[in-house]
Amino acid sequence: MTAKKSQESPMMKAAVFHHAYEPIPIENVPLKSLKESDVRVRIETCSVCHSDLQFVDRGLATFKEPPIILGHEIAGVVAETGKKATAFLPGDRVIVPASISCGTCIFCKSWNETQCENLKIPGNHIDGGYAQFIAVDQRHLTRLPEEFPFELGSLISNVLVGAYHLVFDRVNIRQGETVVIFGCGGFGLSVLQMAKLKQAHVYMVDIFDWKLNIARDYGANGVLNSNKCGVCEEGVCEMLKGKADVVIETIGTPRTLVQAINVLHKGGRMVLSGYADNTLPFLVSKIIMDEIKLIGSVGAPLREIPDVIKLIKDQKIRWKEMISNHFPLDKINEAFNTLRMGQSIRTVVHPNKTKI
């Protein structure tokens, strides 16, 4: 009698987050089966966002309870398609968006996809990009131009298109306005460049001189190391010779939130984009009496990705200086450490490489 062969599920390697304050282990996990309209993407790059550190280092809760695969800045190659996924072929280079909308709720139907009632963020609501593969419905994918490296695709998926959405849609920064950005990470540097396209006067605040030097090279009108001045707010106002029309806070700590609102003039707009679980550390009375507008900004609709791709093709956006380090998947904890130590703007993880 012949023994039946076991029907084992295909497996992949992934960095699986279980608990905060612990290293992330590499595990073998089953490949998810494809729905008819799904595309399986072989992940070439997933860059590390500071929000990933919030889960690991601060215990910020993911929407999906762990275990979960983190990572939301994803680019790769189509490996397999579902029966009705006809828009892409194996071998196509694609960008996976950092926020996935349902397309059917009242917000999606009114072109406000970032406010989707069923919004899914890879690495937060669903498994993300620190893995060899991800399955995504074909309607969420965007083609990555052949001349663009995969790490640029990862930047486009989140920080570049998110910055475009913030500047051109959520805030609509105007020519001649004074803008202060707290944080010279990938998002802050991307917002800087988008705001300069709107001919704003842009000033950057950070604690690392090497990042501020990149900001200056990217066109910042002024930079300030907040660790090298007595009172940050006084240093910013002296640099501006006044106060700001728009303040964009990309870090999310109570300290920087207070600093940000204190450099904003009456009637100004304060944008919150640093992902955190803090309560707001300033008085409601200040918002009321100064008639300050608080604006949240998260992600971007898929339709804005082609606009960002065109800006890059037209050489209006720089990005190479934002890529600081590269690591294979099994060095995921070392990759995270580069951000912890302030040694990186964007560190890129390559899930399907064993050596870099």
Segments predicted by a language model, with ranges:
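Glycine-rich beta-strand-centered segment in the early N-terminal region that forms part
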Residues: 32-46, 59-106, 145-148
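C-terminal hydrophobic helical "lid"/dimerization subdomain
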Residues: 2-10, 258-262, 302-356
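NAD(P)H dinucleotide-binding glycine-rich loop of Rossmann-like/cofactor-binding domains
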Residues: 102-182, 320
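Residues in the short beta-alpha loop(s) of Rossmann-like NAD(P)-binding domains
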Residues: 20, 208, 276, 300
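Glycine-rich cofactor phosphate-binding loops and adjacent beta1-alpha1 units
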Residues: 171, 213-293, 355-356
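Mid-domain Rossmann-like dinucleotide-binding core that forms the NAD(H)/NADP(H) cofactor-binding site
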Residues: 146-229, 235
